Amino acid sequence: MNNSINHKFHHISRAEYQELLAVSRGDAVADYIIDNVSILDLINGGEISGPIVIKGRYIAGVGAEYADAPALQRIDARGATAVPGFIDAHLHIESSMMTPVTFETATLPRGLTTVICDPHEIVNVMGEAGFAWFARCAEQARQNQYLQVSSCVPALEGCDVNGASFTLEQMLAWRDHPQVTGLAEMMDYPGVISGQNALLDKLDAFRHLTLDGHCPGLGGKELNAYITAGIENCHESYQLEEGRRKLQLGMSLMIREGSAARNLNALAPLINEFNSPQCMLCTDDRNPWEIAHEGHIDALIRRLIEQHNVPLHVAYRVASWSTARHFGLNHLGLLAPGKQADIVLLSDARKVTVQQVLVKGEPIDAQTLQAEESARLAQSAPPYGNTIARQPVSASDFALQFTPGKRYRVIDVIHNELITHSHSSVYSENGFDRDDVSFIAVLERYGQRLAPACGLLGGFGLNEGALAATVSHDSHNIVVIGRSAEEMALAVNQVIQDGGGLCVVRNGQVQSHLPLPIAGLMSTDTAQLLAEQIDALKAAARECGPLPDEPFIQMAFLSLPVIPALKLTSQGLFDGEKFAFTTLEVTE
């Protein structure tokens, strides 16, 4: 854990220090004073009464001794509880289908003042140009948007076709950028454990920063070896004892609650007063509909308090201070003198009802963010351009031949989990011996002209129609699920025509589709319009059967080989436990 003060992230000039000290001493006028407020004490528990004094970007003082201090402006908190701004410890903004600018507009008014982002989705499509755009967005954002340098592009060498590489030389060019906090999730954990030099070179290059992990279900000597390599955290834990063991071995535990991977209920019982400095909250992948209707990190805090009886100061601690401390962002995470004034005022701390947000010492106005969004997006120079180098397909591209009496592998979906099971089904003249089997195909979209990789999918709930998307982790090829080859082809051709996006087909017609013009991953629409479009897509998808809560996000992970057990990439069926390709027909 990175506990030392990292001056890379704490930019304050000597002149600012002198002004801040003068206000702290009571010798100068504050910019803002927040009155009639209680401050939740994340260290000791309980509350501190008294004003919060702000000068520039920083807190100059806290407590009753500043009751009569002068200020240019006073903010009446009306009895609110003040907590530090919320921090998401690990996410891919691209999974929200929003640009970083739109994401800020949607989440900053909810108290999310800081994000630790790995932009490996767009980097897999566009390479360094995608990372550079995220850096430009971070530089101009009010929200603290920090970046972890994507470490595994593609996720696993030789297992899929992606759009670009991101070499160590390119990675090093970004290491000293002021918004870079470390190395993003090291997904090739077998390579790390076996000591592959190319991976150890990456870890060594970023060892003075924070090294993110990714090791679902890992245990025993393999987990020990992975941690020995220097990996500091993991967001992929999905079982209680798995999370406990990682904490015991010195890892920090990121408790994830996204739109597809929902691990909070399993892991929340671990959190206590002792280990909470080692526990953090993250969303990883959360779509705009859930952000609009349920919230972001605020929703996770609410559930910790209401459903798991986590004490207030502990719930807010894991949502702010623990993460700031882990990433060496020592100017964040507490409402204390000298810390950055990222403040969330809550009218109800138990329900996480946000009354007002300040970031870097300035109050946030949601309407102003919305009004400025278009101009700020243009200023960031988004990397527009069609990234779909694929010709239209026909139903014959998805034709599979099955032999009666033979057994075939089936990717079995677990609703609201990223892991799958590997099962099999026997084919007869009447079809498969289970009625929930659909067809799945992955089509590379980067001009390699490969035939579609085809397989079988169980448990997804698709009774009719087809779903297609260019959001498919991490290479973001075209993934399609369907009950008929004709409808699969129709869905794929719609997303090709859109230059990337999502599509639902039923009754031989496109029922709903959403173009994603930036890298086939992100929309340029407002958060509200995007949420409405997602609502329409989900409604159309529900007509196809009892699908997962977030069918497109769940579908997006069916091609990610670094999460077990059975996945389908553009190269074929991949056994995520043996880390090797396998065949559709079971022959052993």
UniProtKB/Swiss-Prot annotation:
GO MF term set: adenine deaminase activity
Any coiled-coil regions, as ranges: none
InterPro entries: Adenine_deam, Adenine_deam_C, Amidohydro-rel, Metal-dep_hydrolase_composite, Metal_Hydrolase
Enzyme nomenclature, EC number: 3.5.4.2
UniProt keyword annotations, A-Z: Hydrolase, Manganese
EC class name: hydrolase
Catalytically driven reaction(s): adenine + H2O + H(+) = hypoxanthine + NH4(+)
Entries under CDD domains matching the protein: AdeC
Keyword Hydrolase listed: yes
Obligatory cofactor(s): Mn(2+)
Organism superkingdom: Bacteria
A Pfam family hit: Amidohydro_1
Signal peptide: none
A GO BP annotation: adenine catabolic process
Family classification: Belongs to the metallo-dependent hydrolases superfamily. Adenine deaminase family.
Record's subunit section: Homodimer.
NCBIfam families: ade, PRK10027.1
Name assigned to this protein: Adenine deaminase
Organism listed in the record: Escherichia coli (strain SE11)
High-level lineage: Bacteria, Pseudomonadati, Pseudomonadota, Gammaproteobacteria, Enterobacterales
Primary gene name: ade
